[in-house]
A protein has these predicted regions:
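Selective transmembrane helix interface/packing segments
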Residues: 1-271
């Protein structure tokens, strides 16, 4: 008999050359392909010199909205041109993965997999044999799972964001950027530098677990509600998860933008 199966880690659904392909990897791959197709079409529409179509107007509105959002924080044309594509990539990849997990069939179409549960054999309260009693059980494994509901995906996004922060810092401040981490001018500055290193590492954990925790918790909530009370009752929670998916994508993108900007300015310019 199949039972409700909730796994923190993504489940492998195939193996290629010894590498496990998980349901979250497959979902992220589908989302990436769809985003590439969308932005290729968007780029082609922007080259149109005739009367703009509705799609072109939508693309121009989206791009201009992100440019204005970035400009409101960085106030530099060079940084706007540099940061806007990255922030858009973060936002659309995250929100597409968040919302992809809410589509019909995602998380609900899969296969039943038999598992074995080991139960220690006992008799009259005394262990008779150090053996096991095999009880077959079926657990449901979905073919697709939201990429951002997998800690590996959110951790990768967090590492990319923090690495880009360091790259932009070095690009704008040259070697002077590292004085925020290594500063022997005074004991206090040396201690502050150590704290800065810890904070940079903490950003990775904060980014990764905030996004993963919110999206995974939403998936668990929807799975439990649908399993216990199907049809009408889970619908308001889908609306909530649409909102949460948008907010989490926006928070990740805006925090990345703020950290990018802070890394490109000297300590004296931050205040």
């Amino acid at each position: 008999m199949a039972s409700l199966h909730i796994s923190i880690s993504a489940e492998p659904i195939a193996t290629i050359a010894g590498l496990h392909i998980t349901n979250s990897i497959l979902a992220s791959l589908i989302v990436t392909i769809l985003l590439i197709l969308f932005f290729v079409a968007a780029g082609a529409s922007l080259k149109n010199t005739g009367k703009p179509s509705r799609f072109q107007s939508l693309v121009e509105f989206i791009v201009e909205t992100f440019r204005n959002m970035v400009r409101s924080i960085v106030e530099s044309d060079r940084k706007v041109a540099l940061f806007t594509p990255i922030i858009m990539a973060f936002f659309f990849f995250i929100i597409a993965n968040n919302w992809f997990g809410l589509l019909p069939g995602v998380g609900s179409i899969g296969f039943n997999e038999p598992v074995e549960r080991a139960v220690e054999a006992t008799a009259e309260g005394t262990i008779v044999e150090a053996g096991t009693l095999i009880q077959p059980e079926q657990v449901f494994i979905p073919y697709l799972r939201a990429g951002t509901a997998d800690l590996n995906t959110t951790l990768a996004l967090a590492i990319i964001s923090v690495l880009l922060t360091q790259i932009y810092g070095v690009s704008f401040q040259k070697l002077g950027y590292f004085t925020k981490f290594i500063n022997f001018s005074s004991p206090i500055n040396f201690f502050v530098g150590l704290l800065e290193m810890i904070l940079e590492a903490a950003k990775i954990m904060s980014f990764a677990f905030r996004l993963f925790g919110n999206i995974f918790a939403g998936e668990v909530l929807l799975a439990v509600m649908t399993f216990l009370i199907p049809l009408v009752v889970p619908m308001p929670f889908y609306g909530l998860e649409i909102f949460v998916g948008f907010i989490q994508a926006l928070v990740f993108s805006m925090l990345s933008l703020v950290f990018f900007n802070m890394a490109t300015i000297g300590h004296g310019e931050e205040h």
